[in-house]
């Protein structure tokens, strides 16, 4: 290491980090040139805990993989078992799942934008975003009965139906939310401070997206719209879903992808409710769970989430593997550092990834000469 090179730690406790991890930034003078990310502070072993449990208990654990996008985990868990057991859920349940999934996407993107704006010292816009988010949280609570761990999905459908009065309330609050959102996006697009701290900062080129296998708004901000798994979902195809993408690949592009995805999510919710009104019947079926292996993927707010499972005829989980989007997105971070002039920009580039640490934690054990050797997870 030359005389000008130095390493500084960020975390595991830091004002800009939503969850604990340590970023070891390598600096050449003031400019970041490399990073090493150390994890392991919040590993809980959920995959191992699920083994041997019935899938009706496993779905509650799946909801606790992530505290921000808990809903998409239960939806993917349920749809994986429905795929293995060839269970066809009612149309009502399909559209209600879309409504709730998109509400969760909106609230997650609003948190991501708020945290990013805090990292570039735009506290006013951050507080505005969190205030507007309460409209969405109220809708989620009205539909599911809860605000965080919603307990809404079951194998074979959903737990609660909605009525005409609730639908009118959703339409009314979405109108209010859209008006606020337009003002927020205008401030973000035209603000000189935001442009100074966001444009041409943390650039992730298209070829590095392909190399690191980044997913979600990260790769869509670098020109890869086909990464959105909603394009492959039959219900979203019925709703004529259109992916949002940009080519610049910088912090600004990633945040604008999230803002524009919120607009598309609002449209999808309205469209899903219109289709729901035309449906009749129940919201769930009695599920006969059959043994087998299978996997299912959905588009979480941060990107592709995968559940791979093996279950018995009685519904006991033999093995489960969960891959969350931040696993891939963290690897892309060090390539963003090349266009970060200062340490402060390295921090904002990190928040533009919108990482979720708790759902990324994994424990790897290597067996050598009959001895188990735990391996810590590091992204170099």
From Swiss-Prot:
Answer whether the UniProt record assigns the keyword Transport to this protein. Answer: no
Q: Which UniProt keywords apply?
A: Oxidoreductase
PROSITE patterns, per this entry? COMPLEX1_49K (PS00535), NI_HGENASE_L_1 (PS00507)
Q: Name one GO molecular function term.
A: NAD binding
Record's keyword annotation contains Signal = no
- Which one Pfam family would you cite for this protein? Complex1_49kDa
Can you tell me which family this protein belongs to? Belongs to the complex I 49 kDa subunit family.
Specify the protein name.
Uncharacterized protein MJ0515
The source organism is Methanocaldococcus jannaschii (strain ATCC 43067 / DSM 2661 / JAL-1 / JCM 10045 / NBRC 100440)
